[in-house]
């Protein structure tokens, strides 16, 4: 699930470029990706789980998860694109798997396994190899990109320790998306950056984006955290920049360096190591 989620996330730039061409800005897109997915999530939740009810005691935790993961993280990351290249932002953002693993060990006394450490090292070195020193490097972009990694790590750790995991995943995702969408819509309105799509085709692209990311990638990632834990899921999510790289080469005609190819191989290796650890654990 985490791997499939990372692949879908890796396709986001391709979809976003076409949406931006229609006049929609990044802040509005984050809001729309949450809001447009709500009817689908609600219908599936009602059909599958017969209800959208949740314990009132779960609402504060859901709200914190929503603000961190569905509002703060994407808003910070997307704002960094105004000052530095998206590939640089992605590399800086991916400090979050390190923060999740280290945070789990220091704050929650999780045990560090040899497989986990090896996977984390491969992931870290692999993502760093995506960095190109010739690209723009502005502190105004570095700070929000780094903060997006911090908020994402907090989101993953909170999600992996969420007490009410018995809440059906579609119901959970509905409330997380509703709160996240409301917060980002408010930010867009207050900052006067609300630029809605104009044509039917533009709305269609935004809907496709919302269904792919919110109903697809986000839901799969949330479920994977519940199943395998935040540390492993965050390392596996490093396949996202690798997917973006191959999309850029095969579809957008972008160039590729030896470092990026080696980085991709290391990221894939980190995923295989984590997967192998899971197989060994089941056999034992």
Q: Which ranges hold each PLM region?
A:
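Hydrophobic/aromatic residues within transmembrane alpha-helices
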Residues: 19, 29, 33, 80, ...
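Membrane-interface helix-cap regions at the ends of transmembrane helices
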Residues: 11, 15, 22, 37-57, ...
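C-terminal transmembrane-helix exit sites in multi-pass transporters
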Residues: 40, 45, 77, 96-118, ...
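Specific transmembrane alpha-helical segments of multi-pass solute transporters/efflux pumps
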Residues: 8, 13, 45-87, 92-93, ...
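Helix-helix packing/entry segments at the starts of transmembrane helices
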Residues: 6, 32, 74, 88-95, ...
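Transmembrane alpha-helices of multi-pass small-molecule transport proteins
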Residues: 22-72, 99-100, 150-158, 173-192, ...
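Hydrophobic transmembrane alpha-helices of multi-pass small-molecule transport proteins
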Residues: 103, 112-132, 152, 238, ...
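Glycine-/small-residue-enriched transmembrane alpha-helix faces in small-molecule transporters
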Residues: 1-28, 32, 134-161, 183, ...
